[in-house]
């Protein structure tokens, strides 16, 4: 099925809400503390990521949309870290600084793919003057196609009714990720996106689909909403609108590692898609696909356009895992956070045959993820001669990506993938044939990083060159 992504580059969105910084400390756990019955984590990696409303803005920016973020911060290192990180991904920050309060920060300690503890550093922003937030919203209304109110009950949205009114008067849809059980404060919003627990805390426990629909429609009527989207974890999503049949969408998640920030991804994709001019039903379709991608990553994460396109088209149609170098680096970083062993190989793979398939399957068995780096058409021509490749790069990558053993496919322009390998630094570099390990491009860089290099045998009798010669011989008869 041909699926066109929304014109995200034309979308303008403002996000207003509770901004926070997510800190992650990673390290191995090898012993119990003598001071208390708790594990000792030897921290070797520290990461900082925008969270809360800032993660919503990150998700919108990652799609290529134009986004402005408004929220409350302190005047501290956390606020500066947020501004710097967000500016690097093209999020325009317009924070209101509150000297008496720290920027909300959440610290998570992780070891062996498990979160051991979370520490929150915060003081609520309730009671502050909301006028600076209102002024920023008013200034942006003429240039945005959607307003997102990201509520984590930290004080940025105490005047949410005024914000809704300002946007609706300007004809701008208001999307809200709600918090708590007081949905009266969201009266008049275009769309609420509660998860199932949040929905049932307000509407009551639902024993069936029909009951969920009935109670959801009552909430829409009670609070003058235009629509309600209930996110239901492994059961997918349900969109409810007045005078329309319910739209149930099954989950698209293949693996679930972490649901942190998944709600931010959903509302971010919804807003960007609506602001690009698509319908609400289309926006939900793309948001559901994006949620299936992001829960397969560790921590608050975003979804790139190519990941979203792969998700909505499906593996068989797109060559799942065909990536740019930057997208591959991000995918590898996420895999390593999950403790996965990354294997990498390379080749032309012009006419895929049984030998290739067997070799790649064996390579995949040596780790958790397999990267295949493919020579570009120009690189192949220099290596194999003017008559090659038989199949252009795009087709070769699609075929490789369709193999169950292959996770990610990337191309390179040079004669060898040495530069690419040095940038990825796989845990294991493999090559087929009769090479010596030290002859393999990238081996020195992998060894220097503590990785391994291995040579695997090809299946006897399988050769692209022999296949081409046989075809030529048969055609001459």
From Swiss-Prot:
Function description: Catalyzes the ADP transfer from ATP to D-glycero-beta-D-manno-heptose 1-phosphate, yielding ADP-D-glycero-beta-D-manno-heptose.
Primary gene name: hldE
Enzyme class label: transferase
Provenance organism: Salmonella dublin (strain CT_02021853)
Annotated InterPro entries: Bifunc_HldE, Carboh/pur_kinase_PfkB_CS, Cyt_trans-like, PfkB_dom, RfaE_dom_I, RfaE_dom_II, Ribokinase-like, Rossmann-like_a/b/a_fold
Region named Cytidylyltransferase: 344-477
A family per Pfam: CTP_transf_like
Keyword vocabulary terms for this entry: ATP-binding, Carbohydrate metabolism, Kinase, Multifunctional enzyme, Nucleotide-binding, Nucleotidyltransferase, Transferase
An annotated GO cellular component: cytosol
Complex formation: Homodimer.
Active-site residues per Swiss-Prot or TrEMBL entry: 264
Protein name: Bifunctional protein HldE
Catalytically driven reaction(s): D-glycero-beta-D-manno-heptose 7-phosphate + ATP = D-glycero-beta-D-manno-heptose 1,7-bisphosphate + ADP + H(+); D-glycero-beta-D-manno-heptose 1-phosphate + ATP + H(+) = ADP-D-glycero-beta-D-manno-heptose + diphosphate
Pathway listed: Nucleotide-sugar biosynthesis; ADP-L-glycero-beta-D-manno-heptose biosynthesis; ADP-L-glycero-beta-D-manno-heptose from D-glycero-beta-D-manno-heptose 7-phosphate: step 1/4; Nucleotide-sugar biosynthesis; ADP-L-glycero-beta-D-manno-heptose biosynthesis; ADP-L-glycero-beta-D-manno-heptose from D-glycero-beta-D-manno-heptose 7-phosphate: step 3/4
GO biological process, one term: ADP-L-glycero-beta-D-manno-heptose biosynthetic process
EC number(s) given by UniProt: 2.7.1.167, 2.7.7.70
């Amino acid at each position: 099925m041909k699926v066109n992504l929304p014109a995200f580059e034309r979308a303008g969105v403002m996000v207003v809400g509770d901004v926070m910084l997510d800190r992650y400390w990673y390290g191995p756990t090898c012993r119990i503390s003598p001071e208390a019955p708790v594990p000792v984590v030897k921290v070797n990696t520290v990461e900082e990521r925008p969270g809360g409303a800032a993660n919503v803005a990150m998700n919108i920016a990652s799609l290529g949309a134009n986004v402005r973020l408004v929220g409350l911060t302190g005047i501290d290192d956390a606020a500066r870290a947020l501004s710097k990180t967000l500016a690097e991904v093209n999020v325009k920050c317009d924070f209101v600084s509150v000297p008496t309060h720290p920027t909300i920060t959440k610290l998570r300690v992780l070891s062996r793919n498990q979160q051991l503890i979370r520490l929150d550093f915060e003081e609520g922003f309730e009671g502050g003057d909301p006028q600076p937030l209102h002024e920023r919203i008013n200034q942006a209304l003429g240039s945005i196609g959607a307003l997102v109110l990201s509520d984590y009950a930290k004080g940025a949205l105490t005047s949410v009714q005024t914000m809704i009114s300002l946007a609706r008067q300007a004809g701008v849809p208001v999307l809200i990720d709600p918090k708590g059980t007081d949905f009266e404060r969201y009266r008049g919003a275009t769309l609420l996106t509660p998860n199932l627990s949040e929905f049932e805390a307000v509407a009551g426990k639902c024993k069936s689909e029909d009951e969920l629909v009935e109670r959801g429609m009552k909430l829409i009527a009670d609070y003058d909403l235009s629509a309600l989207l209930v996110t239901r974890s492994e059961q997918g999503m349900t969109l409810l609108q007045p005078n329309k049949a319910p739209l149930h969408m099954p989950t698209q998640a293949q693996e679930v590692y972490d649901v942190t920030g998944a709600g931010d991804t959903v509302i971010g994709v919804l807003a960007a898609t609506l602001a690009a001019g698509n319908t609400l039903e289309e926006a939900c379709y793309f948001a559901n696909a994006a949620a299936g991608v992001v829960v397969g990553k560790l921590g608050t994460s975003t979804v790139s356009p190519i990941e979203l396109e792969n998700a909505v088209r499906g593996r068989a149609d797109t060559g799942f895992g065909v990536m740019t170098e930057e997208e591959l680096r991000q995918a590898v970083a996420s895999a390593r956070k999950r403790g996965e062993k990354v294997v990498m190989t390379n080749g032309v793979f012009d006419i895929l045959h049984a030998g290739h398939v067997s070799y790649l399957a064996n390579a995949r068995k040596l780790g958790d993820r397999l990267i295949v780096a493919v020579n570009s058409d120009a690189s192949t021509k220099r290596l194999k001669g003017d008559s090659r490749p038989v199949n252009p790069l795009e087709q070769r990558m699609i075929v490789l990506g369709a193999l169950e053993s292959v996770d990610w496919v990337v191309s390179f322009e040079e004669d060898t993938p040495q530069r690419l390998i040095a940038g990825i630094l796989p845990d294991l570099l493999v090559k087929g044939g009769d090479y010596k390990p030290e002859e393999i491009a990238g081996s020195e860089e992998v060894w220097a990083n503590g990785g391994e290099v291995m040579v695997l045998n090809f299946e006897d009798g399988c050769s692209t060159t022999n296949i081409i010669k046989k075809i030529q011989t048969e055609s001459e008869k």
